[in-house]
Amino acid sequence: MHQLRFVPPRQRGIDPVGEAEVYLTYQRYKRARQVLRHTIQNEPDNLPAHILLLHTYYLLESSQDYCQLASKLQGRLAHRPEWAHICHVGRSLAPEYPLFQQSMH
């Protein structure tokens, strides 16, 4: 089976977060990761893409990537309702990671 060339969703008139959600629904986690990473590279302020990428890292059990991205996003998300969930999930992936321990206090 040959690899299809990646064409960014925006170039096809498609919302990248929506496309990644479809990939996640069908357990195509690596494809969702590819879409979201490309989106964030080109749209660094796309917060929904960042949050969905965190979820994708969780599904891939990629604790290092999850921790790095959560650390990067802490300043933007710490006062939002999503942050408590991000830390809860983070503790399940990396219970020893200090960032997620701080949120318990």
Where are these regions (language model features)?
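Structured alpha-helical
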Residues: P48-A49
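Intrinsically disordered, low-complexity, charge-biased linker/tail regions
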Residues: M1-R31, H38-N42, Q64, L69-H105
